[in-house]
């Protein structure tokens, strides 16, 4: 939904700058990547995108905004959480032990019920999930490195799922300024001064 709103902004020829208000503790990689892709397209049109952080700019919230032209954060904004996790619930024990229901799976192949929650994952499935999480983490640290003009090892040093206050994020290079949304709007206006 939010990606569509940004796409509509991108298609509006009267837009000269965008202030992106981020107030998110995170979300799915797919949704974050869709939103980031739309922001990238806005920037390719030469339109500055300035981020303004509210209470949170963590995980997916940071993913979508790391490449903004300028990032404003409140001193206490929870920022970063550059990390990835995945989980697949296993309710088989609860069904058997508490509800006294046994499950008999019938599958087309060994891994067809991997996401079915009715059994624990086997080692091959755990290895697959771990590789997937590590691949996404590598992408995340790479896009942060590009957006914040840092090296991937420098990002990894401050990432690993940790959360920083806005003031700490400023000190380590994850944001550019401590300021309010009004500061971000003022900066956006100055960035387009004279642009028609």
Per-segment meaning from a language model:
Residues 186-196:
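C-terminal intrinsically disordered, low-complexity extensions immediately downstream
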Residues 149-179:
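Amphipathic alpha-helical substructures
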Residues 25, 160-164, 181-188:
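Active/binding-pocket-proximal capping segment
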Residues 1-49, 56-147, 195-196:
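Small-residue-centered hinge/linker elements
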Residues 70-74, 173-184:
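Short, well-structured beta-strand/strand-turn elements
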């Amino acid at each position: 939904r939010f990606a569509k709103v940004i796409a509509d902004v991108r298609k509006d020829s009267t837009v000269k700058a965008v202030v992106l208000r981020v107030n998110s503790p995170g979300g799915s990689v797919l949704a974050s990547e869709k939103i980031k892709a739309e922001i990238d397209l806005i920037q390719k049109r030469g339109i500055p995108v300035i981020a303004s952080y509210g209470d949170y700019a963590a995980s997916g919230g940071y993913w979508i905004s790391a490449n903004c032209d300028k990032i404003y954060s409140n001193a206490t904004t929870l920022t970063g959480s550059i990390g990835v996790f995945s989980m697949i619930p296993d309710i088989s024990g609860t069904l058997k032990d508490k509800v006294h229901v046994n499950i008999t799976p019938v599958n087309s192949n060994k891994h067809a019920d991997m996401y079915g929650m009715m059994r624990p994952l086997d080692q091959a499935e755990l290895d697959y999930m771990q590789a997937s999480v590590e691949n996404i983490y590598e992408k995340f640290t790479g896009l942060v490195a590009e957006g914040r003009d840092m090296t991937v090892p420098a990002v990894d040093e401050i990432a690993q799922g940790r959360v920083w206050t806005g003031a700490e994020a400023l000190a380590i290079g994850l944001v550019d300024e401590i300021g309010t949304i009004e500061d971000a709007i003022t900066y956006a206006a100055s960035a387009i001064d004279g642009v028609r």
